[in-house]
Amino acid sequence: MRSPRTRGRPGRPLSLLLALLCALRAKVCGASGQFELEILSMQNVNGELQNGNCCGGARNPGDRKCTRDECDTYFKVCLKEYQSRVTAGGPCSFGSGSTPVIGGNTFNLKASRGNDRNRIVLPFSFAWPRSYTLLVEAWDSSNDTIQPDSIIEKASHSGMINPSRQWQTLKQNTGIAHFEYQIRVTCDDHYYGFGCNKFCRPRDDFFGHYACDQNGNKTCMEGWMGPECNKAICRQGCSPKHGSCKLPGDCRCQYGWQGLYCDKCIPHPGCVHGTCNEPWQCLCETNWGGQLCDKDLNYCGTHQPCLNRGTCSNTGPDKYQCSCPEGYSGPNCEIAEHACLSDPCHNRGSCKETSSGFECECSPGWTGPTCSTNIDDCSPNNCSHGGTCQDLVNGFKCVCPPQWTGKTCQLDANECEAKPCVNARSCKNLIASYYCDCLPGWMGQNCDININDCLGQCQNDASCRDLVNGYRCICPPGYAGDHCERDIDECASNPCLNGGHCQNEINRFQCLCPTGFSGNLCQLDIDYCEPNPCQNGAQCYNRASDYFCKCPEDYEGKNCSHLKDHCRTTPCEVIDSCTVAMASNDTPEGVRYISSNVCGPHGKCKSESGGKFTCDCNKGFTGTYCHENINDCEGNPCTNGGTCIDGVNSYKCICSDGWEGAHCENNINDCSQNPCHYGGTCRDLVNDFYCDCKNGWKGKTCHSRDSQCDEATCNNGGTCYDEVDTFKCMCPGGWEGTTCNIARNSSCLPNPCHNGGTCVVNGDSFTCVCKEGWEGPICTQNTNDCSPHPCYNSGTCVDGDNWYRCECAPGFAGPDCRININECQSSPCAFGATCVDEINGYQCICPPGHSGAKCHEVSGRSCITMGRVILDGAKWDDDCNTCQCLNGRVACSKVWCGPRPCRLHKGHGECPNGQSCIPVLDDQCFVRPCTGAGECRSSSLQPVKTKCTSDSYYQDNCANITFTFNKEMMSPGLTTEHICSELRNLNILKNVSAEYSIYIACEPSLSANNEIHVAISAEDIRDDGNPVKEITDKIIDLVSKRDGNSSLIAAVAEVRVQRRPLKNRTDFLVPLLSSVLTVAWVCCLVTAFYWCVRKRRRKPSSHTHSAPEDNTTNNVREQLNQIKNPIEKHGANTVPIKDYENKNSKMSKIRTHNSEVEEDDMDKHQQKVRFAKQPVYTLVDREEKVPQRTPTKHPNWTNKQDNRDLESAQSLNRMEYIV
């Protein structure tokens, strides 16, 4: 069974894995920061919108001030990539936002800075490009969902801004309203650099031990190094090859090595007199041999065994032989025969022979058998206080440390005699030391170090100058005091005049002026013309609470900022490519010439022969239409690696790190802040500095006595190595230089920006500043200059690089195709004809006697009629007919016009000679009352009878039509003849009646008071055409489409036309069917006769006289089909057409007696009910079988009915049209 301790071990690797994932996640973060904007103040005195209207709607007629509520002001912000020519379109690629409603017409929020209501924060997660374009708009909230919000004023700004805690203030002082705002860019926590894309988070754990400096560079904690500061610095001197460490100051040896610094190898075990270069070697010392170096190869030299000046010779390992001098013998010459003869005593020693050899009496300072050993007078050490003893012959010498003196260093030395104190009041000798009494401001043993009195003294970003025993704070503007701790109150002197409120700010004040005053001190009456809001040279007139711009003739708008479109309201004439003529009352000629603006806003047009032109461009622009901004960066005027950004007839250099100036020609003095401590001398480098340290100080800034490396020595993750007299930085990839401060490979090489875009280096990333006409991260998206569509009158817009061209449709001209070309300008019409200009053409209205497209053709002979001369081709109306003169012959349409309507009370003159005004019969009054209505008739004029009979169809030379009218849409006093006269005057009869004689007669219906039966007949019918059918079809079409302006047609509710039945195509069945039908008919007659006889016998007194039948104009009742028009449902212009074929059937009614009142009344009642209750108007064409006619047989009326209910209707052949 596992112990709990054993089970818990997997948690440690898991925690390490999680920590590693967190570290990797932190590395993925590319950039993080935020763009902040704060609204400071708003001044919209009149409460107006950008279009000049009031926020509340109405104005006071007296002073023209807005009288209703103030504006509900809020702001919108759009942040996008840098644009040299700011355009409002396109996405807000860097972000957008808005505030809530924060005030009315005028407000000031400077005293409440930090309020989130007037602040807009746009976070970003990309490398901040430094260059930007900002659009700020003030809006009036409508506070409802119906009316849209309205814009008050807008401002745009393009520039550069680096991340900083400081605010940058911007103002909008033109237009309707003035407002002030401030912006800044700040990096999120742990993000640094100009692009907020340098990530550095302090840590002290397994993955690193470092802090972060103000530039985001990792500064390793003491004892650590490496890009991630996770490599411990070993004990100084530790062999980098054979030693390592996991903790600072440690030195752990590899296997086979030993020593304090792991620089000594371990020899072979048992090696006696040998060394090693690699572990486990035994390299013998001189005169030693053997596998373990334990064999003495120089026994004579090592042991000196031969005595009495005997000569020793090595004969083998550990072997020797002594050659004795005269008087001595023995293996080691130890036996003396005449020992003193050889003078064995050295160093002035005296020899005495003895029985065993000799004996030496040594002189002072020497000892040993032969007086060859110097007596060590330094043993024991006679020197005190750490003095070093040097042995002499019969004596010694003490070398004393500086603090001591005397023969045996027993006396204290006076160090003050050497005057070691530099900036001291006095020097005091101490035992084994001294003490310097330093002057104020100095420290150190010798009082040679100036005390840094500046640490933590100056406030509010003031700079401190260190003095001797003191400091001086150099305060930034707006602060005072010894420590710059006091904000100077600029309002103490009450500088604001005229009741203005003074608001104290840092190094300045602002006067909040009351209404009616302006200026820095509220000393001026508000002059709305200063600064001049009027553009394009317009003159500004100051008013009590507003201003007025008197615009030049070519501009319009509140501020004269919009180019006036003269051709919008006044006809224009194209003179040439540069000039357009327009009517004007300001010139004696009545014509003013204006520019066509073909060269755009940056050029002037010059006309040339042949309709050509050239553009004289303003400075900074070129191209056919002056649409191209000249690249002022060509030739690269920026030096020392600076990046050039092109402007309009100008350029701007963005300098590399370490350089400044208009052309980046000046090296920034990195020594200006005096970074070298303790008297070190600073030498300026490019984007770096070097400190020449003194008095034993070391490091990048002379801050340490122990190491050349400090936390800021190597930049950009470089690793610092202490090399005693100097330091060396090991730079990571992409950086070089003594302190890793120079980028090796620029992210702009090769240039990633397309289409002439400028690449700006931003750390290890880049930003593209695109030329006009291009946009996108790398300037690959062509700006759509055709959006919104600038070409009028169906002109085609051709998009170019920062330009567009309108290709006009035929008949139009001008840069935006707004001008209709006057084709009548060349006077193309002949003989004084009138020319009417049209789009891409013209029309000539010819004078009498001329014809043709240009009236150059002379017409034929004139006509003389009714005593008047009529020119050839002329037309005139003659009652209901139209006449025309055709080469001397008068040709008129042939429509019978009927009796002329007249008014009884007007007396003579209304009727032609021989006719009189006869009152209209009561049954002829269609829309009552018809008081005073009459018709012109003569006693000799007989009524015209048409050739229509009850079995006539409009395929013949006759048509029977029944019109049902909506009398509510008709004027009172209309007679049947009035309606018939309007039908005869329809334009559709003009062309048809020129070839045929047309007769139209009308009778009121006896079955319904809102119906009129119309009979149309024609004479002179030819085989190649049927005018009656054509007229009938045109009338049906006119009613169904509600065509024309006739009030009569508009009042028609239903039309019924009698159709011809289809002929049987099976010819051989005709005789058979005729026989069958004849027999059947006879049977029916017999049956009917029998039934009538029986009925009369049952009811002999039930018969009465029947009402006269409605036979149209011939007293014959037609068999009709329904024509209905759905105008009440679908309107008067268009009517949908539907096919309801096979959905209706005929309901037959058989009548056996012509005089039966019940059946006749029932028939009339059914018609009235049917016509009165059908609200939907339909047009029905029906073809049906016609029963055989008898003199007493009346045609059947048919109702629409579902054909699925009557099987008998399946044999009928019909056609229906619903219009």
From Swiss-Prot:
InterPro entries: DSL (IPR001774), EGF-like_Ca-bd_dom (IPR001881), EGF-like_CS (IPR013032), EGF-like_dom (IPR000742), EGF-type_Asp/Asn_hydroxyl_site (IPR000152), EGF_Ca-bd_CS (IPR018097), Growth_fac_rcpt_cys_sf (IPR009030), JAG1_1/2_dom (IPR056986). CDD domains: EGF_CA (cd00054). GO terms for cellular component: adherens junction; apical part of cell; apical plasma membrane; membrane; plasma membrane. It holds the Pfam family DSL. Keywords: Calcium, Cell membrane, Developmental protein, Disulfide bond, EGF-like domain, Glycoprotein, Membrane, Notch signaling pathway, Repeat, Signal, Transmembrane, Transmembrane helix. Residues 1189-1200 have a biased composition (Polar residues). Residues 34-1067 are extracellular. Glycans are attached at residues 143, 217, 382, 559, 745, 960, 991, 1045, 1064. Residues 185-229 form the DSL domain. One of its GO terms (biological process) is inner ear auditory receptor cell differentiation. Residues 1182-1219 are annotated as: Disordered. GO terms for molecular function: calcium ion binding; molecular adaptor activity; Notch binding; phospholipid binding; receptor ligand activity. Residues 1-33 form the signal peptide. Residues 230-263, 264-294, 296-334, 336-372, 374-410, 412-448, 450-485, 487-523, 525-561, 586-627, 629-665, 667-703, 705-741, 744-780, 782-818, 820-856 form the EGF-like domain. The keyword Thylakoid does not apply. It is found in: Membrane; Cell membrane. It is a single-pass type I membrane protein. Interacts with NOTCH1. Interacts with NOTCH2 and NOTCH3. Ligand for multiple Notch receptors and involved in the mediation of Notch signaling. May be involved in cell-fate decisions during hematopoiesis. Enhances fibroblast growth factor-induced angiogenesis (in vitro). Seems to be involved in early and late stages of mammalian cardiovascular development. Inhibits myoblast differentiation. May regulate fibroblast growth factor-induced angiogenesis. This is Protein jagged-1. It comes from Rattus norvegicus.
